[in-house]
A protein has these predicted regions:
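Hydrophobic alpha-helical segments, chiefly the membrane-spanning helices
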Residues: 1-312
Length: 312
């Protein structure tokens, strides 16, 4: 019971800390006169992936590499299967042109790059981490050069400058909350795995990854209910790209990762590749450039089968 309470407390701190850090980071960026296009693509995207980054980096550093990997793989599965699936049950989404030419191809390329690095030698080292981070910067430069309208749409609504002391407060408290939340979450997850005699991978792929995906789920559902334009398939795909290239890349640079539980390579990573590929035919059939409740049910079913097969 205490371990579960630790995990829940950690998740709450991660979510709250992530929001505080985002507010402070965006406000500071505007104070420094950084162009909105750069803020939208770099600051916002990076900070919204901060919970996954902190959890994975601390897990690897503490000697729990499977928890670090399963958090990212599971989070990517949850973004497309759970978050997008639930969102589509609430309303319909029109797919933007950038999905075909940028979002989906880059997500698949990042997924295959990650797969090729870790599948062959069951190890993600600093060299691979540097390559992944450099690939992310190349992607960002491409977006800034050719996809400016799409990036501007991703900017947060709060752009009014805060008093400077509030900015510092949000930045400091957000960073502390993220660190503390990750500590509690990792401690609770490892203890829970030991208590029920299950692998760290199982806890990471299910509870931890879903927990770190809660901000995306909350934002997507609220935006859909309010009929706002802020939510798109591109938002979730962008989150997956950052998870793979930024979270895994930076984590590997800080602490190289060795796969201990082979089911990550024999099972989980193939499901991640599969659901990433599945998005493309779902967009085209039965109604082109549109996703509705039927596609949402398919994605939720795929995610449910993934979880069932994971615990077998």
């Amino acid at each position: 019971m205490l371990d579960l309470l630790l995990m829940i407390s950690g998740l709450i701190l991660l979510i709250v800390g992530g929001n505080w850090l985002l507010k402070g980071a965006v406000d500071l960026s505007f104070r420094l006169n950084i162009p909105k296009i750069v803020v939208g693509m770099t600051v916002v995207s990076f900070v919204t992936s901060a919970p996954e980054l902190v959890v994975s980096a601390q897990s690897a550093f503490k000697g729990y590499p499977d928890l670090a990997l399963s958090n990212v793989v599971g989070s990517n599965m949850a973004n497309l299967g759970l978050v997008l699936g639930i969102t589509l049950l609430i309303g319909r989404l029109d797919v933007r042109r950038s999905f075909y030419f940028t979002d989906w191809p880059v997500m698949m390329a990042a997924s295959l790059l990650f797969f090729s690095f870790i599948y062959l030698d069951k190890y993600l080292g600093r060299t691979e981490g540097v390559i992944m981070v450099v690939s992310l910067f190349v992607f960002i430069i491409y977006l800034l050069r050719f996809q400016k309208p799409a990036v501007v749409e991703e900017l947060p609504e709060f752009v009014n400058l805060l008093p400077i002391h509030n900015t510092v407060f949000y930045l400091g408290l957000g960073a502390v909350a993220l660190w503390g939340g990750a500590e509690l979450l990792i401690s609770g997850a490892v203890n829970l795995a030991n208590l029920f005699n299950v692998s760290e991978r199982l806890v990471g792929i299910s509870i931890v990854s879903v927990g770190t995906s809660i901000p995306e789920m909350a934002a997507s559902v609220v935006a859909m209910v309010r009929k706002e334009k802020a939510i798109s398939v591109g938002n979730l795909i962008g989150s997956n790209i950052f998870n793979l290239l930024a979270v895994m890349g930076i984590t590997a640079i800080i602490q190289p990762i060795e796969v201990l539980d082979q089911r990550l390579l024999q099972h989980d990573i193939f499901w991640m590749l599969g659901i990433s590929f599945l998005i493309l035919p779902l967009v085209f059939f039965p109604s082109r450039q549109r996703l509705g409740w039927k596609e949402g049910l398919i994605l939720l079913a795929v995610y449910a089968f993934f979880l069932i097969s994971t615990f077998k």
